[in-house]
Amino acid sequence: LFLVLNLGFLVFWVIFKFRYVIIPFLGFVMGFGPVRSYTPFNVTHSTADATMKVLSYNTWGFGKFPLITRDNTILQYIKKQDADIVCLQESYLTEYGVRVADTLMGRNYPYQDECNEGNGGLRILSKYPIIRKIPINFEQPTTNLACAWLLRRGIDTMLVVNCHLQSIGITDVEKADFKEMVRGTLSTDSSRIESHKLLWRLGSANAQRAGQVKAVMALLRKFPNTSTLLCGDFNSS
């Protein structure tokens, strides 16, 4: 929106009063950093041979399909990306689903492991040997998960951490009520109730997520000199 408005003013001043072009120009200069951070326009270029490609994906149970097949769009996408390391969240599969996924991608990823306590369903697919799995324990009971793996890449050892942290957990009904509240179509009393409910959910989720982050950080501090890759669905956007 900032770019569009600023560009519009730039065109306007070019046509009607050229000397004022400096105003939107300064806007572009001052806003370059934030815009570049949130809208990273990258020029395609060839990658070095030593480049490592990583994919992190919350599959949502591979689309919540009752029966996963080779044609599953998420499986096909993962295969097409051909990443060196794949970290998946909510990747719980039946035994049949595991066989289907292995048939489709097992040749690409000879090293695989999972962490399936609760409903988190963390999975790692790797082209590098897995040396060791390190579960990360959260203090509060939860269905969320975090797990780490040590991989051997050439002569180096690297730590890969895969997380699925606490979400706010807003229901579809609450989302609809919140939209009405924002639009101003919800009654005053209902708006007050919904705002309190939302604040409570935000506070509760953030408190739980903070504890989970501490557990992940505690593990990372145990490997200060190890190359580390941190992936996951952090539910904090």
Which residue stretches match the model-derived regions?
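Structured beta-strand-rich core segments of catalytic domains in phosphoester-bond hydrolases
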Residues: 29-49, 66-67, 75-79, 84-181
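Acidic/histidine-rich helix-loop elements
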Residues: 56-71, 169-205
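Active-site beta-strand/loop signature of hydrolases that rely on acidic residues for catalysis
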Residues: 53-59, 74-98, 159-164, 201-202, ...
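Alpha-helix initiation/capping motif
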Residues: 1, 15-17, 61, 93, ...
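Transmembrane alpha-helices and immediately adjacent membrane-cytoplasm interface residues
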Residues: 2-45
